[in-house]
Amino acid sequence: MTYEEWYNKYIESTIIPTGNANWKTNEQGYVIVTKQIPKIIKHYRTAIHAEPNSVVMHYGKPGPHEQMDYDFYDENGYLAMQIHCGNHLMPKKHKFGEFGEHAAHWEWTQKEGKWKGHPLPNTELTEKERRLVHGGIEFKRTQR
């Protein structure tokens, strides 16, 4: 096996974004959050890399319109998807679901030898995505 073959088999496959992940869920199909950012942090900046297969839950803008947001990372630790359980106080731009809940899937491209990620246009939550973040949507429902 040449060095290039070895590298491609054992190294490169672990450092490229795949979008594939095995996020843990409970019996009801709700995602198990691996890291929760405390509410005292006023503005959490989402990391583009984290622990592989992890889910980070953080809060949007504090106050009466607070929402839970979730960041999902793929099997190699790249940001794969974000689910926002509200409209970020911008209902005209987020006409999704009951509360403006929506998903942003990430696309990764290689430029000049580095992986660059950007979110694709926001989308309505699928039933599977809605089930994953059930707790965040219920939290939003209690604010009425």
Question: What name fits each language-model region?
Answer:
Residues Y3-R144:
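Catalytic toxin/effector domains delivered as secreted proteins or via bacterial secretion systems
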